């Protein structure tokens, strides 16, 4: 019970341990397993950095730590909502990264719960600005909103933090900049107000504030329309007439619930100002000095079919670059639309717009000399928006820039050029948000924007980007210089007057500070003021507008005027959030292009260039605007490159062409760029200068390869959070690698410090020479460790460039790190160049094989997820199940898949059934086919008959002791005195004799007993052979004993059906039990998955299984118990029958108590083996088999490791079982000795009581019991050692499970639920193995204790009980023919030697002689209780060996000296002679036996119970009943063995009378010593010294004066004197009882007349000195000793006969001679008792008799 509690507690602990472990594993599963591969996982989220960063909300006016602020998270009430602007707009922070389904669910719930609530902006990190606007703002609505917010939290558990947007967070940081501080604060004359409008909550409150604050509404524009109910609106208001301070106005507006952003604006300070023969060479060939245009000339791309959008000052449509006779529209050569706010279609003189558009698309058909200065995309057209309000007034940009883009986009313009900027920067403002929003909404629309010209924005920074140029999605271009030769060529194309006047306007009119120039330095141009003179006279102006000074600078200052150097005026990044801007550089100084002549331009004006003199149709300009125009033309060429399919092989292939996205165009331009010079400003060059020639596949014998994933589906790939896309290639030669990733990012929020919304990451994995190198986007670091990779978290452009990349495999990885707005598209361009071969597409390396790192990844599996492991080819192995879905478990057997618990249980039952069928089949085979040696009845029919009659029969040794007197001894007794005898003693006697002389045998008290030695019928010729032993080393009667498992099982054959059914039910119980861990694992899965509703159903299944197990266990237990009871009853019956079939030698060798112990305890042991040990062992083996199946299905690795201690336990159990088997035999033998002693004591209880020997007997019994106790104590100690050792092995297995199993779970090799199941299965197998080991030792113990059972059951008696001839009647003619016989205990000492005697029918033959002479043995041989060693015994001439033994016994009967009665009634004892006898026959027999009278005198008469062994009767009564039993049998041959020797005179007379009646007409053989019995015989045979020394009638023998004569002298006390005895005639005709008795009376009368001769006493009690006390010196005068004594003395010459009863002490004749057996006093007491009964001596004569016997 304690063990079960311990296992249950341990299992519960492990369950909780694994449950907590699995929860932590679930939370970190993305760190342990991989969506695509191990390396992906390691580098995928390194850019997130510290987890704390993902908990921050980055706002311009605050950084909110949600882990600190969440203590009052969503603590909304009426008061707080009123205080927080009624709570219309909220910031909601979620646990990141944010997955697609979370985002979609948030949108859905906002719309449903808040009547059209929506996401307005994303704010890093993981935060959304959302609207939750109700129908009104009353108290009831606020209370309802609290409930809805809490409901939202419940529906979206990933919400970590949620609070209203506070007013302080809505104010732009521009208000704090220098340009709007101090005196300039008054220059803020406008505010831009962004608010969210809902149909349920209009902007009435804002309108009210405008009215109350005396603000003037300048403009109200819809900047985004998210759905039918919600809009984001921009309001621009004028502050000129307001009576309130700026701070008050801002505060009042910020408190409005609908407002989310406020920015400053100023009509005075904020200006939108505009910020190419040689440029063509630069962007196409990479250098202006290389006068080639391969994009135009080699592959023929000039922008055909492309439309460019542009918004600028206007276009001189009469210029030859644009002129067409067709009206502006789709048929116009260059301009398909012209939108002008003023309604004109002209540009100012030297207008910026004309120059920009000419740089992009300008081309002429009039003058070839001018065509050299055509635009970069000369075959393209333009959709133009005129932004100029008036000459010299700059640009008029409407508040909503998206309207500009929409107008050009509607004309199918996909590239738009903005060559202007405001002087606000470099913050991400509402203006920037609009630019990015439009491109997000139109992903094929690319805005190319100038980086701006260097302007001091009023803060201390070298970064000079404008708010527009901080746009993420726009291609922002900075200006780079062209070669000095280009500068010199452009000197005549500068409009110096225009430059001078522009400076004067900026300084004098607009008040701008330019290099410290004052208004007096730039007087108005007049006839008296020459601009060149004015410019050249001023050292500052000389560097700006003095042509000679500038020409000299062009020639001498190579530091500044060199190719690729960023222009000094070009805007420099980064942006305020640290992003890289500008993206690219393009030639912007100088650019010669079309010149506007203003309103006075003439049609198609385009004067030629003659003799190097500049034409008035062209003008040189510089600025980032010109660079933007050049880059725009390059973008147009790239679009055609993809649209017409040039990207495949440089030729038109429209079938593969597609419309590229803006991000692909941008990525391609950046991919071709290169940084050609070093710069002191880190962010000044972006990603370098454009070089489109890199797109050409073959140039100058170098090979360029492009991989454009967007071209596969003709659309950009899509990615979401947690996803990874891979593009892989290999290099066969060294080459340069350029990889560019660009995505159009959702618009950022002006509220946030950081603008990146969707975070993608680029990585390149290089596998070169077995080493892994990792490159990340925008990083120059090469990472070797995946955990150290750092990613760019700011830019939506990422670039990897590798110079001279070595041969190897390369995998490009695009990670969806945190896609907060789902379905982000992206573009990636992969280009290799410089190698001799093309890059080859290859299979992506799914992992990087590292022998020291077991890499794995998750994979899809039916009804579950799996894992894969990295192989040496950098590919993952086959998907192996890691975890099954809820309700499924993994079958690691045949199916290798996730199956239902029921299916796996059935599968296990099937396997277990097959296993059970094999086992049960083997058992049935044994039961049916194996022939049990123990139960085989044929063994009694297969005996070979003795070879009698020739004296040469073969005797086989079957002794349990020593075979001769010279063998070495093995003393296994408890004797206190050692002897020198060579006998093997197995007794507990304390006295040993040192004599080797012949031993005289005591007469057996019953037939087959006596003192002739232990009988044996084995052959004599093999008497010296080595003894035979069984498989365990035990000697067994010369016969092999089978105790194999098959023999044991076969004993249960009659109960095989019951046992088979019990085993079948037990197998069902095992199968049901094996389902329990699986059900428990299923419960764990449901608990783990949170599906608690299904747990109750599973628990019900669990309960049904338990109930089924209880029922099955009950039934199988009943059947096993029933089988056990039937087995024990049957085996006791079988054993008893086997005992009764044994020959008398068997019984002589064993004690009755021992046999009773075997019949009781040994049979119980066998029953325990058959019905307990073996079935339970089979059940436990089945449990082991089924459990092993399940354990190896779950995890073969864990199974092998956990079960490794068990073989040690099994080996230990094997040796321990063998030891227990041996020691169990000793215990059983010791208990048998004790039982034997107890049986003997109880059998002789009267003697014990008379001698008051109770304490002595108890002491002896205690001593014997202590022997078994000591042995059992030793066995108990070993049992304890074994139990503790086996327990240690069990706990060791549990420890290994905890250690190794947890590591397998953490490594993904094992699911948590399966580890739980494994833990629950482990006690099954450890318990079963322990049980098997215990049952094995129990089996060995029972086997040892049941050894004697099998010895008895399998012992084949030497005398065949079955078969042989049968006769219904015999004459009774018995003849001994040279019969020799020796007992098996002393085969060297013949008891009978060549005996020849004949017993004729109708005669009485008396056998007399010294005790131990062989008289009783002869009777036993006649009844064939033993086999003779030589000669033959015949009955009616037929050898008795040929007789059927039971039939032989039907003709022979015996009456023993001590009759054997049974504890039944008198009638039952008499019927033992004839079971079919009637009551009348019984009465008649009793009358003849003189027993009727005393029987009828008893209360119950013949039905009187006489008690055990007839204890209720006297000796004479028992003898007469025995005679009656013989009379009723009516035998032909009657054997009488001292029938009256123990009776008193009266009883003797009655018995003798009954004998006289019995002997008439039969062959009678009498063994007797009383003359009254002997003298009735016809023939007397004296048996002495193993032979018949005398034989004849009594008269003849008396006349011979031989041994019979001496016998008579002893009885009459006339030793040494002549007896004159007259015997009556004893003829057959005159003989009667009276005459026969007269013989005795005559002898007695003669003996009484003579005096008794004095007895000669010896000098020593143990001496045979023949001198008596009175005549010690006259020995010669003594009469010679009688022949009787001489015969005994002659017998001393022979070797002593050994008694073979194992526990009988044997004494030998002393060295001085004489014959005696046992204690002399005991013998004399017996002799005197007999003498008194015979009447030969009175009580006074007993001393003389004693002296005489001692003398002999």
Curated annotation (Swiss-Prot):
Keyword Ion transport part of the UniProt annotation: no
Localization per record: Membrane
Annotated transmembrane regions: 909-929, 1058-1078, 1102-1122, 1174-1194, 1200-1220, 1285-1305, 1315-1335
Compositionally biased tracts (Basic and acidic residues): 1631-1642
Residues bound to ATP: 1409-1416
Keywords for the protein's UniProt record, in alphabetical order: ATP-binding, Differentiation, Glycoprotein, Hydrolase, Membrane, Nucleotide-binding, Protease, Serine protease, Signal, Transmembrane, Transmembrane helix, Transport
Predominant cellular place of this UniProt entry's protein: membrane
EC annotation from Swiss-Prot or TrEMBL: 3.4.21.-
Membrane topology: Multi-pass membrane protein
Function, in words: Required for a general cell fate determination at the onset of development. Required for the specification of an initial population of prespore cells in which tagA is expressed. Required for normal SDF-2 signaling during spore encapsulation.
Protein name (record): Serine protease/ABC transporter B family protein tagA
């Amino acid at each position: 019970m304690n063990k079960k509690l311990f296992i249950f507690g341990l299992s519960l602990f492990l369950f909780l341990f694994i449950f907590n472990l699995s929860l932590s594993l679930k939370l970190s599963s993305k760190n342990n397993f991989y969506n695509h591969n191990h390396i992906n996982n390691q580098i995928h989220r390194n850019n997130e950095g510290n987890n704390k960063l993902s908990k921050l909300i980055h706002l311009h006016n605050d950084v909110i730590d949600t882990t600190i602020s969440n203590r009052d998270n969503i603590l909304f009430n009426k008061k707080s909502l009123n205080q927080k602007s009624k709570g219309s707009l909220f910031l909601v922070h979620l646990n990141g990264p944010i997955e697609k389904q979370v985002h979609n669910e948030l949108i859905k719930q906002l719309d449903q719960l808040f009547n059209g609530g929506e996401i307005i902006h994303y704010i890093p990190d993981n935060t959304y600005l959302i609207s939750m606007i109700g129908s009104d703002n009353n108290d009831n609505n606020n209370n309802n909103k609290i409930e809805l917010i809490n409901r939202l939290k419940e529906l979206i558990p990933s919400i970590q933090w949620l609070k209203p947007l506070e007013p302080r967070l809505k104010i732009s940081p521009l208000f704090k900049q220098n340009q709007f501080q101090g005196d300039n604060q008054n220059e803020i004359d406008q505010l831009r107000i962004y608010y969210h409008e809902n149909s349920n909550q209009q902007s009435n409150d804002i309108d009210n504030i405008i009215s109350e604050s005396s603000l003037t509404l300048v403009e109200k524009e819809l900047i985004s329309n998210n759905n039918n109910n919600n809009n984001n609106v921009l309001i621009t208001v004028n502050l000129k007439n307001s009576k309130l301070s700026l701070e008050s106005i801002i505060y009042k507006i910020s408190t409005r619930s609908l407002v989310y952003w406020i920015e400053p604006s100023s009509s005075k300070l904020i200006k939108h100002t505009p910020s190419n023969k040689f440029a063509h060479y630069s962007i196409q060939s990479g250098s202006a000095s290389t006068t080639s245009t391969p994009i135009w000339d080699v592959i023929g791309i000039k922008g055909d079919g492309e439309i460019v959008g542009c918004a600028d000052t206007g276009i001189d449509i009469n210029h030859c670059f644009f002129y067409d006779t067709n009206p502006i529209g789709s048929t116009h050569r260059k301009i398909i639309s012209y939108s002008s706010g003023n309604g004109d279609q002209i540009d100012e003189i030297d207008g910026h717009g004309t120059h920009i558009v000419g740089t992009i698309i300008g081309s002429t058909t009039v003058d070839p000399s001018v065509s050299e200065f055509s635009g970069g995309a000369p075959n393209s057209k333009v959709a133009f928006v005129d932004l100029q309000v008036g000459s010299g007034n700059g640009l008029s940009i409407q508040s909503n820039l998206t309207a500009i883009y929409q107008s050009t986009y509607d004309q199918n313009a996909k590239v738009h050029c903005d060559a202007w900027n405001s002087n606000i920067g470099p913050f991400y403002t509402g203006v920037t948000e609009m630019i990015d929003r439009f491109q997000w909404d139109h992903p094929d629309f690319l805005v190319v924007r100038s980086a701006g010209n260097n302007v001091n924005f009023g803060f201390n920074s070298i970064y000079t980007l404008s708010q527009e140029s901080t746009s993420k999605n726009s291609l922002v271009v900075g200006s780079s210089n062209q070669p000095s030769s280009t500068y010199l060529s452009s000197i005549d194309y500068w409009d110096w007057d225009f430059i001078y006047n522009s400076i004067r306007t900026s300084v004098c009119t607009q008040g701008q500070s330019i290099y410290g120039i004052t208004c007096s330095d730039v007087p108005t141009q007049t006839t008296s003021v020459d601009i060149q003179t004015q410019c050249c006279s001023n050292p500052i102006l000389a560097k700006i507008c003095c042509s000679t000074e500038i020409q000299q600078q062009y020639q001498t200052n190579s530091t500044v005027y060199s190719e690729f150097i960023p222009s000094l005026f070009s805007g420099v990044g980064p942006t305020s959030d640290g992003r890289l801007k500008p993206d690219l550089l393009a030639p912007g100084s100088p650019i010669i292009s079309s010149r506007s002549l203003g309103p006075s331009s003439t049609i198609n004006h385009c004067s030629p260039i003659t003799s190097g003199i500049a034409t008035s149709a062209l003008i040189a300009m510089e600025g980032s605007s010109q660079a933007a125009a050049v880059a725009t033309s390059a973008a147009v060429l790239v679009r055609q490159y993809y649209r017409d399919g040039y990207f495949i092989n440089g030729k038109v292939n429209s079938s593969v062409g597609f419309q590229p996205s803006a991000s692909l165009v941008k990525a391609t331009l950046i991919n071709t760029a290169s940084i050609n010079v070093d710069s002191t400003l880190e962010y000044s060059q972006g990603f370098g200068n454009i070089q489109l020639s890199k797109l050409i596949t073959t140039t100058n014998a170098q090979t360029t390869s492009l991989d454009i994933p967007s071209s596969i589906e003709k659309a950009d790939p899509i990615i979401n959070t947690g996803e990874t896309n891979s593009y892989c290639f290999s290099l066969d030669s060294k080459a340069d690698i350029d990889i560019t990733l660009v995505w159009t990012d959702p618009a950022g929020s002006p509220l946030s410090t950081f603008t990146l919304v969707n975070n993608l990451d680029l990585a390149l994995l290089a596998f070169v020479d077995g080493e892994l190198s990792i490159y990340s986007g925008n990083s120059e670091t090469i990472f070797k460790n995946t955990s150290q990779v750092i990613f760019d978290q700011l830019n939506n452009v990422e670039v990897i460039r590798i110079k001279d990349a070595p041969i190897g495999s390369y995998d490009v990885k695009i990670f969806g790190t945190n896609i907060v707005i789902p379905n982000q598209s992206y573009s990636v361009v992969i280009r290799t160049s410089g190698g001799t071969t093309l890059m080859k597409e290859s299979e992506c390396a799914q992992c990087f094989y590292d022998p020291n790192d077991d890499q794995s990844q998750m994979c899809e599996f039916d009804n579950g997820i799996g894992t894969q492991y990295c192989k040496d080819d950098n590919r993952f192995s086959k998907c192996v199940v890691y975890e099954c879905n809820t309700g499924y478990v993994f079958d690691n057997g045949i199916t290798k898949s996730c199956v239902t618990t029921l299916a796996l249980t059935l599968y296990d039952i099937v396997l277990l059934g097959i296993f059970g069928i094999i086992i049960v089949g083997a058992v049935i085979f044994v039961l049916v086919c194996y022939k049990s040696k123990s139960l085989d009845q044929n063994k009694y029919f297969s005996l070979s008959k003795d070879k009698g009659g020739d004296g040469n029969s073969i005797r086989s040794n079957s002794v349990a002791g020593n075979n001769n007197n010279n063998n070495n001894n093995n003393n296994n007794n408890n004797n206190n005195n050692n002897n020198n005898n060579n006998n093997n003693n197995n007794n507990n006697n304390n006295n040993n004799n040192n004599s080797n002389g012949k031993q005289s045998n005591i007469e057996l008290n019953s037939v087959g007993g006596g003192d002739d030695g232990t009988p044996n019928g084995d052959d004599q010729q093999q008497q010296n052979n080595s003894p035979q032993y069984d498989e365990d080393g035990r000697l067994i009667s010369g016969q092999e004993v089978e105790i194999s498992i098959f023999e044991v099982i076969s004993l249960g054959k009659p109960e095989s059906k019951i046992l088979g059914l019990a085993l079948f039910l037990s197998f069902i119980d095992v199968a049901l039990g094996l389902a329990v861990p699986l059900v428990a694992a299923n419960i764990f899965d449901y608990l783990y998955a949170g599906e608690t509703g299904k747990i109750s159903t599973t628990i019900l299944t669990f309960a049904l299984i338990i109930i089924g197990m209880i029922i099955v266990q009950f039934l199988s237990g009943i059947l096993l118990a029933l089988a056990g009871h039937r087995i024990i009853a049957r085996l006791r019956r079988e054993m008893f029958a086997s005992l009764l079939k044994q020959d008398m030698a068997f019984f002589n060798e064993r004690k009755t108590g021992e046999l009773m112990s075997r019949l009781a305890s040994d049979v119980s042991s066998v029953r325990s083996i058959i019905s307990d040990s073996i079935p339970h062992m089979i059940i436990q083996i089945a449990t082991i088999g089924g459990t092993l199946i399940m354990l190896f299905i779950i995890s073969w690795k864990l199974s092998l490791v956990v079960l490794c201690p068990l073989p040690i336990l099994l080996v230990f159990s094997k040796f321990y079982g063998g030891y227990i088997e041996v020691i169990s035999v000793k215990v059983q033998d010791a208990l048998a000795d004790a039982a034997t002693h107890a049986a003997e004591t109880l059998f002789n209880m009267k003697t014990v009581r008379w001698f008051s020997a109770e304490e002595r007997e108890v002491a002896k019994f205690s001593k014997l019991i202590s022997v078994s106790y000591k042995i059992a104590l030793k066995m108990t100690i070993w049992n304890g050692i074994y139990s503790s050792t086996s327990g240690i092995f069990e706990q060791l297995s549990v420890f290994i499970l905890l250690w190794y199993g947890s590591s397998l779970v953490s490594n993904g090799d094992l699911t948590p639920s399966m580890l739980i199941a494994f833990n629950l299965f482990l006690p099954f197998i450890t318990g079963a193995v322990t049980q098997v080991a215990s049952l094995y030792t129990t089996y060995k113990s029972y086997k040892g204790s049941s050894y004697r059972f099998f010895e008895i059951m399998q012992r084949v008696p030497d005398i065949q009980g079955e078969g042989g001839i049968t006769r219904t009647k015999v004459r009774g003619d018995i003849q001994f023919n040279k019969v020799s016989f020796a007992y098996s205990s002393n085969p060297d000492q013949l008891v009978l030697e060549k005996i020849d005697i004949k017993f004729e029918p109708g005669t009485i033959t008396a056998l007399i002689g010294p005790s131990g002479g062989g008289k009783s043995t002869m009777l036993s041989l006649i009844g064939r209780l033993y086999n003779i060693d030589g000669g033959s015994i015949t009955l009616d001439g037929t050898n008795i060996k040929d007789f059927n033994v039971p039939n032989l016994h039907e003709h022979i009967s015996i009456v023993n000296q001590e009759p054997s009665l049974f504890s039944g009634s008198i009638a039952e004892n008499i019927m033992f002679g004839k079971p079919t006898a009637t009551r009348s026959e019984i009465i008649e027999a009793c009358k003849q036996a003189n027993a009727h009278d005393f029987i009828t005198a008893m209360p119950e008469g013949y039905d009187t119970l006489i008690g055990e062994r007839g204890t209720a009767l006297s000796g004479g009564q028992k003898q007469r009943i025995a005679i009656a039993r013989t009379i009723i049998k009516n035998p032909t041959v009657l054997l009488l063995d001292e029938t009256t020797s123990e009776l008193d005179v009266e009883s003797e007379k009655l018995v003798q009378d009954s004998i006289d009646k019995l002997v008439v007409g039969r062959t009678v053989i009498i063994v007797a010593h009383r003359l009254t019995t002997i003298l009735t015989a016809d023939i007397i045979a004296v048996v002495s010294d193993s032979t018949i020394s005398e034989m004849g009638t009594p008269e003849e023998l008396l006349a011979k004066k031989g041994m019979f004569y001496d016998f008579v002298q002893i009885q009459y006390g006339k030793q040494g004197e002549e007896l004159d005895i007259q015997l009556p005639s004893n003829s057959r005709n005159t003989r009667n009882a009276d005459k026969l008795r007269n013989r005795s009376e005559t002898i007695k009368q003669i003996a009484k007349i003579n005096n008794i001769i004095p007895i000669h006493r010896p000098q020593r009690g143990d001496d045979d000195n023949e001198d008596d006390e009175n005549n010690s010196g006259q020995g010669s005068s003594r009469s010679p000793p009688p022949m009787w004594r001489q015969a005994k003395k002659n017998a001393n010459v022979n070797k002593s006969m050994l008694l073979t009863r194992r526990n009988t002490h044997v004494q030998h004749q002393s060295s001085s001679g004489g014959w005696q057996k046992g204690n002399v006093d005991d013998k004399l007491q017996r002799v005197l008792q007999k003498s008194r009964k015979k009447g030969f001596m009175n009580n006074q004569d007993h001393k003389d008799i004693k002296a005489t016997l001692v003398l002999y």
